[in-house]
Amino acid sequence: VREVSELAYADYIQKELPRHEYLGELVGEKLIYYPTVTREAFRHTGRLTTAIESGKLFEDIGLKPLDPTVDRAMICGSPSMLKETCNILDRQGFEVSPGLGEPGDYVFERAFVE
């Protein structure tokens, strides 16, 4: 997002979801929330796609870079962000799911694709 005020789900993800009756335990073990802002000072700044390509994202969260043999991705965002992220994944050997219910290494939000 551009500004901290646009981190619409931050409180829910960080405060409410970990206490959720059914999802809380899973969230605590699996979910890594990495908010980044492009136009204000914040603990993580810049585009997420840049952080992926530079390796900064993985350095910050302490995980290995994305690997199509073990990772899957679900992408949503603006049309330009979707296109850029799909291109990154394609270059790294990920295969897009061709359609609803069809297997692939990643899926993206098709409602807003140009």
Model-derived features: where do they sit?
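Reductase modules of NAD(P)H-dependent flavoproteins
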Residues: 5-114
